Amino acid sequence: MIIGFDAKRANANFTGLGNYSRFMVDTMATYGDEHKYRMYIPKQCKNASYDSLLKHKNVSSILPRSSVMKRFRALWRTFFIKRGLLQDGVQLYHGLSNELPVGIHRTGIRSVVTIHDLIFLRYPQYYHRLDRIIYNRKFNYACRKADRIVAVSECTKRDIVCLLYTSPSPRDMRRS
């Protein structure tokens, strides 16, 4: 199986989301060595921890292919990455940091999203209004369209059900 990852945070983030993303890819590549893993990143950042993932023979890093998409990386990651996923034969896509590409459910590619927290809904006073609107749309969309949802804690799982009104069934919701 070919598994694609939204690896933006694995490459560009050196704390929580980045550590989680790198851990997931490393663990999957180590114990699921019969599969191939594609890490999709909007741009290459200098990151030795990310680069060490490429030592696995079954892991590769994918950047936007066209010069236009290299300039409009956010659009590529949100809307246009699907074309590359299909060209690369990806069968499962994991949004490691709360997001999925728009329309992925129409591609035939199964999807998983990891939700880390909904702190922007719990404590909205600490977030700009526009950021809350964007996060709310992205998180809601991902939870509605994903084949599986991974909640990083029981608290996050409860928040997903309570604040995003997403039932744990019929799609499974797992706590990592």
Language-model segments: residues:
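Carbohydrate transferase catalytic cores enriched for Leloir-type hexosyltransferases
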Residues: 1-167
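Single conserved hydrophobic/aromatic residue that forms the stacking wall/gate
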Residues: 165-176
